[in-house]
């Protein structure tokens, strides 16, 4: 009988339970498991960005179960900052190989390809001034870069943190893997959480910066855009961006390729594949592998708190930047632009545009801002990719 109890004790001593409850740093595992459960709750019950928060949350859950060894960070984050292919071959598991798509910058451009097949640039083409609102909303990126530098982050880390202000998860992941891969988990979680909280974060800022009269402005219907314009737009944008800022070419190019596939109407089968099956598969791989990087050792520190605070500042300043420029355009056009559409310049598509619509209808039930707000919204997608290219060009 004694031998049986001895064996049971030895099994327990080598279990994850013992690591959590009877080791000095075991509490960190418990905290991370709690955080993972919160993310899963937000995804499942509150339905906040469930397509990404669910796989990220479950990846976080898996990687913080002691002794499972599901992900080996030292393969990717080391003194050389290059992949240790020898260690990958000898010790790598499934998640390590899936994470190669993140580390090598494969998944975010493919996500952009899928987004392109679902994006309608007609509101932007019909009203090119929307591009200015999309650009103004990127103010949060560069404002937060300065704030991160003041807190002692390096240029690379500050650039990766600042990109949260673009409200574009794939772009944030892409920039972080290029500039500060050791911060990937914290930045990805912050970026997607704030994207999910757009309806909570934006309205108070929008109302604080606009008057009731401005919120009631009714905009005239935009002009009709021809099929030729829709086909030429992605081609022209790709050429201009790639020649001006090569580091943004892959993100913008994939976005525009997806859109050209959609607008041309000649490759319907692969358009559906890119926007559905391919994008769904990549989303699973991206979310789960990023979640697996959020282990207790790299996530539970003061830097994560600073990133969360800086992230919400970035988002708030970006929203304010778009609204303020919207107010300027309202004055310049003698009241033809509703400043509320400026908040849609962040690239949370189409959620930010829906927020503009909702706030506008609170003050004028007959006001329909959704299509007008989609112009700055899709401009924000391009703007965040261009901002990413600038940061990578300067600090990569």
What is the predicted function of each stretch?
Residues 238-322:
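Transmembrane helical segments that form the transport core of multi-pass membrane transport proteins
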Residues 193-266:
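Membrane-embedded hairpin module used as a gating/binding unit in multi-pass transport
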Residues 146-155, 187-215, 321-334, 379-396:
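Juxtamembrane and boundary regions of transmembrane helices in multi-pass small-molecule transporters
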Residues 1-77, 90:
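N-terminal alpha-helical transmembrane segments of multi-pass membrane transport
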């Amino acid at each position: 009988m004694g031998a049986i109890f001895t064996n049971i004790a030895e099994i327990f001593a080598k279990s994850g339970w013992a690591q959590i409850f009877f080791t000095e740093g075991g509490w960190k595992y418990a905290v991370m498991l709690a955080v993972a459960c919160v993310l899963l709750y937000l995804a499942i019950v509150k339905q906040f960005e469930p397509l990404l928060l669910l796989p990220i949350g479950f990846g976080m859950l898996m990687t913080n179960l002691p002794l499972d060894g599901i992900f080996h960070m030292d393969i990717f984050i080391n003194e050389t900052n290059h992949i240790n292919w020898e260690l990958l071959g000898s010790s790598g598991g499934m998640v390590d190989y899936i994470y190669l798509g993140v580390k090598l910058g494969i998944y975010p451009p493919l996500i952009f390809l899928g987004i392109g097949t679902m994006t309608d640039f007609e509101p932007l083409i019909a009203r090119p001034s929307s591009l200015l609102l999309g650009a103004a909303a990127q103010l949060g990126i560069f404002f937060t870069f300065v704030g991160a530098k003041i807190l002692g982050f390096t240029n690379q880390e500050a650039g990766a943190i600042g990109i949260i202000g673009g409200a574009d998860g794939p772009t944030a992941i892409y920039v972080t893997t290029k500039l500060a891969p050791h911060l990937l988990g914290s930045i990805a979680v912050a970026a997607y959480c704030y994207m999910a909280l757009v309806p909570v974060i934006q309205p108070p800022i929008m109302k604080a910066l606009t008057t009731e009269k401005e919120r009631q402005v009714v905009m005239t219907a935009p002009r009709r855009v021809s099929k030729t314009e829709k086909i030429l737009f992605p081609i022209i944008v790709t050429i201009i961006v790639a020649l001006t800022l090569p580091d943004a070419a892959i993100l913008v190019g994939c976005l525009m390729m997806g859109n050209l596939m959609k607008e041309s109407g000649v490759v319907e089968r692969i358009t559906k594949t890119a926007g559905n099956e391919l994008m769904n598969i990549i989303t699973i791989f991206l979310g789960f592998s990023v979640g697996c990087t959020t282990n207790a050792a790299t996530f539970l520190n003061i830097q994560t708190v600073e990133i969360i605070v800086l992230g919400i500042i970035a988002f708030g300043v970006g929203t304010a930047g778009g609204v303020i420029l919207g107010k300027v355009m309202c004055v310049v056009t003698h009241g033809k632009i509703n400043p509320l559409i400026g908040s849609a310049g962040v690239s949370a598509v189409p959620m930010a545009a829906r927020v503009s619509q909702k706030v506008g209808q609170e003050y004028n039930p007959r006001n329909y801002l959704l299509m007008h707000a989609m112009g700055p919204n899709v401009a924000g997608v391009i703007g965040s990719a261009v901002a990413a290219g600038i940061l990578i060009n300067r600090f990569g």
